[in-house]
Amino acid sequence: MMSRRTVLMAAALLVGGVTACSDLTGANGRADGVYYLQTVNNNGLPFSYVDNSTGHTLTVLSDQYVLNTDGTYSDQQSYTDNGAQSSYTESGNWSQSGTLVTFTPFFSSTNNTTAYQATISNSGYSGTKTMSVNFSGTVWYYST
């Protein structure tokens, strides 16, 4: 017969092991974390494109999303506009349903507060989370 101490130790290890792995593995892991832009349309940074509304050449240098556990987020982007250094900031709320994350901005430095979505995935082995956002056919790929 197992001692009470052995049973309690086994139970603690089982609960601890399940808790430690629950939000880092599988397709439906929690989305909170810090995401750094890696590629745009599979092209590394810096990434340049022409803004159709202004005709200016924009070059993205970096972009970082911070998704907080309280459901708020911030986005900080550094870019050049026809060679002049500039930045973009956005903040708001985020929600998650499975692998889909919805961003609802309440502030945008360009005054665009239209909600948009991203797809999240998690690596069960490395714990790395990835996020892809499709902005009008241009796919921005981020990782933690």
List each language-model region with its residue ranges:
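Lipid interaction determinants
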Residues: 22-144
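C-terminal motif of bacterial Sec signal peptides marking the signal peptidase cleavage site
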Residues: 17-20
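Bacterial N-terminal signal peptides that target proteins for export
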Residues: 1-8
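Sec-dependent N-terminal signal peptides
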Residues: 8-15
